[in-house]
UniProtKB/Swiss-Prot annotation:
One of its GO terms (molecular function) is phosphatidylglycerol-prolipoprotein diacylglyceryl transferase activity. GO terms for biological process: lipoprotein biosynthetic process. Catalyzes the transfer of the diacylglyceryl group from phosphatidylglycerol to the sulfhydryl group of the N-terminal cysteine of a prolipoprotein, the first step in the formation of mature lipoproteins. It comes from Leptospira interrogans serogroup Icterohaemorrhagiae serovar Lai (strain 56601). A 1,2-diacyl-sn-glycero-3-phospho-(1'-sn-glycerol) binds at residue 164. Its EC number is 2.5.1.145. This is Phosphatidylglycerol--prolipoprotein diacylglyceryl transferase. The keyword Cell membrane applies. GO terms for cellular component: plasma membrane. Keywords: Cell inner membrane, Cell membrane, Membrane, Transferase, Transmembrane, Transmembrane helix. The chain crosses the membrane at residues 24-44, 60-80, 115-135, 198-218, 285-305. The keyword Transmembrane applies. It is a multi-pass membrane protein. Pathway: Protein modification; lipoprotein biosynthesis (diacylglyceryl transfer).
Length: 318
């Protein structure tokens, strides 16, 4: 995996200005920026094509990104909540100390450090807060929320697809558990974390491929079918929800709704450093992302059934 791209001629300047080394921009950040630029190119064109107001595209993108970052961090904190606020011998209370000390309890996950670090992002938190932020913006300016969300779907799909490539290339850890299946690219030997060299499911690439397929579907076919208003948005909720639900069966994630006994190492601190962690891991219950996926699927299906969104408009309105 390639975590960063070195820029040798900038390192001396960075060291002179900030008195520290700089290894170069992260591949994750670069691909996230490419995803943002791609979306910023497509969205105003789609708004204009639909006879909406393209001048809102910049704010929609910026608020979408801001909401994504805020929500992804908040959901990550919820995900590791029981690793932050724990009874620790020698310390008074399990809530006050983590709230008043940046690094929290010694040897434990910290609240503030994780909240403001560059890592630790939960997709569905970002997805929900991103939609919330742009919806509040559209509500404030009295825009047609359903039409604008329809217009944003292709940009959301391509942005997510490129962003997931960043997860894979940088080796940020959102991989699957070990497998003996041999499928080029979809299974790879992970060297970015412990245990090194274990063949695992390449879940970031799997999600990226699926999201690229969604983009092609919405960009080159569905948007030209004259579906009823919000059909595109509702379809995306259902399709993306199903995709995420299924991929999560291959990922290493904590089960918030367990259905069977957990793997032997799952509740041991720093278990990922044990070579047997990934090889003995298995899906043992629904994760936070899977529960949110089910809710999103149901929401999308509700709108499709309630408004009969499989039907097409009688006359073109775009």
């Amino acid at each position: 995996m390639i975590d960063r791209i070195p820029v040798p001629f900038l390192n001396p300047l960075f060291k002179f200005l900030f008195n520290r080394e700089w290894d170069g921009p992260s591949t994750f950040s670069i691909l996230m920026m490419i995803g943002f630029l791609t979306a910023s190119y497509l969205l105003p064109k789609e708004l204009k094509r639909r006879k909406l107001e393209p001048e809102h595209s910049d704010w929609l993108l910026l608020l979408g990104i801001l909401g994504t970052l805020v929500g992804a961090k908040i959901f990550f904190v919820f995900e590791i909540w029981d690793q932050i606020f724990v009874e620790t011998p020698g310390f008074d209370g399990k809530y006050i100390y983590p709230l008043t000390h940046w690094y929290g309890f010694p040897g434990r996950m910290s609240l503030w450090d994780n909240l403001f670090s560059g890592s630790g992002l939960v997709f569905y938190g970002g997805f929900l807060f991103g939609i919330l932020f742009i919806t509040l913006y559209m509500k404030y300016f009295q825009l047609d929320i359903a039409s604008y969300l329809d217009a944003a779907v292709p940009s959301m799909a391509i942005g997510y697809a490129i962003g997931r490539l960043g997860c894979w290339v940088s080796g940020d850890g959102c991989y699957g558990f070990a497998t003996n299946v041999e499928i080029p690219l979809l299974v790879f030997n992970y060297h970015g974390a412990h245990p090194s060299g274990v063949p695992v499911w390449n879940t970031p690439l799997i999600e990226s491929i699926i999201s690229f397929l969604f983009f092609f579907y919405f960009q080159f076919w569905a948007r030209n079918q004259n579906f009823k208003k919000f059909s595109i948005g509702a379809q995306y909720l259902v399709l993306h929800g199903f995709a995420r639900l299924l991929v999560e069966f291959l990922r290493v994630n904590k089960a918030v709704f367990p259905l069977m006994d957990p793997p032997a190492f799952v509740n041991i601190p720093n278990a990922e450093q044990n070579p047997e962690f990934l090889t003995q891991y298995y899906w043992h219950g629904f994760s936070q992302s899977q529960l949110v996926s089910i809710i999103i699927i149901l929401v999308g299906a509700f709108f499709i059934l309630k408004w009969k969104l499989w039907k097409k408009e009688n006359t073109s309105n775009i």
